[in-house]
Amino acid sequence: PIMRALLRLSAFILCQSLCAAPVLAEGKSIIVLDASGSMWGQIEGRAKLEIAREALGTVLSSMDPETEIGLMAYGHREKGSCEDIELVVPPAAGTAQAITDAANAMQFLGKTPLSEAVRRAAAELKSTEEKATVILITDGIETCEADPCALGAELEASGVDFTAHVVGFGLTEEEGKAVACLAEN
């Protein structure tokens, strides 16, 4: 199928999931970072936002500097808003430091409009004739009344050479399934 999906769920070690996934090999990529208020929660005594930032840094430092990658975030500017989605760093080669700096400066305070954020990232990448990859890093499920499963099916049907990767952590089994269908479709 045109949309290939990889689901990596990790209960505790986000970095191992991200570092093991060959998600940044070719084409353009956008990492969609969950900056919602729930990222202040903890796993084994560590804030989830700290784990996500560390994993992001590890992935970026291990990739080819010529890889075109960008960063989109949600929940980082407004508390309680489903519209708080921003392309913070447009996909380009050599953006690793800009992405790291943006993630390190980010506030974590809003809701989780993950479906709309992935839709916008896919739209941003749609103009490319290369393979396009969206990597969603999240600790939660959709909180803005959208359906990640329907979005996955819609993106699959759109005909874009598109891959979605979902890295979920700190999720219950039910929450994991709700997010996984985005990538599985």
Where are these regions (language model features)?
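Solvent-exposed loop/turn segments at secondary-structure junctions
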Residues: 35-39, 75-80, 95, 108-111, ...
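Short beta-strand-loop
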Residues: 42, 67-104, 119-128, 145-150, ...
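VWA/integrin I-like adhesion module and closely mimicked acidic/polar interface patches used
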Residues: 105-106, 140-185
